[in-house]
Amino acid sequence: MSEIPAIEVLDLQKSFGENKAVQGVRFEVKQGEIFSLLGPNGAGKTTTISMLSCLLRPNDGDARVMGHSIRSDQMGVKSVLGVVPQEIALYEDLTARENLSFWGKMYGLRGSKLKLRVDEVLDIIGLRDRAKERVSKYSGGMKRRVNIGVALLHKPKVIYMDEPTVGIDPQSRRNILDSVVALKNEGMTVLYTTHYMEEAEELSDHIGIMDHGKLIACGTGEELVKLVGQQTRIDLTLNGDGANVMSLWRDIDGVSRVFAEDGLVSVLVTDSNLVLPHLFEAAAKLLIRITSVDIREPNLEAVFLHLTGRALRD
């Protein structure tokens, strides 16, 4: 008998008035894997998480978490689920230990079992040595780590993490990413949302790319990169007006796309070694000097650009 999926999403739809926030999203997450929903702000990631957490009721479709329907068995869903929201849901005047103890009691833990689990969670989030300090004294990254700890208290089989590294320092970000991997190593299933391409690439077994409420691609990182073929992106800084040279570059063999972004001119090519000399030659004809060159191999940013026509951070 095959293992049931940890999460099975079946054509979820959610609208707010005329705004179609989620449109027919369908994907499956295997038990014990990290699945990332990658997309820009407003793509529908948080709305999807809210429906999968039973906080929002879908207009249509369904989903099952460890076999429990979000429509007909919400208590079953909540019994196997931990949720780390974007917002910090802590009592600032309490210490980290007191916060975890409070929420542990909400999950029904008492006495020695509560203390043991709080200690375990403090070790997981790396804050045992700061556990007696008030949360109000913590950095944003430390607060987010306690937020994660709250979601782990009842040992859920599945955990949702909604943009957990937004607005925090690099060290805290590294700690959170390491903790995500540690959770997977303990057999937990993680559904992770982010707009940081490098996080999705580093963490994920499978990645779903969302845009304007739709899941536009899904697969392993390697499978997704194959969608753009072997295209390489060349970012160039020009000393002069780039409009005319961009027109010349578009006619060069091996160039598939030329566009301007963030003060750079970007060129998508099949072979950078063959094309680059021709880029310099065309620029020289117009007396335009190329002052910097950055060659970037295919990645999820290129996939998003290929699928939507714009950069992930737009």
Task: Please give the residue ranges for each predicted region.
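Conserved ABC transporter NBD signature motif
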Residues: G61-S72, G76-V77
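Conserved ABC ATPase "signature" region
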Residues: S101, K105-G108, S112-R130
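Conserved catalytic motifs of ABC-family nucleotide-binding domains
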Residues: K155
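Catalytic Walker B motif of ABC-type/P-loop ATPase nucleotide-binding domains
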Residues: I159-D162
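ABC transporter nucleotide-binding domain
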Residues: L177-T270
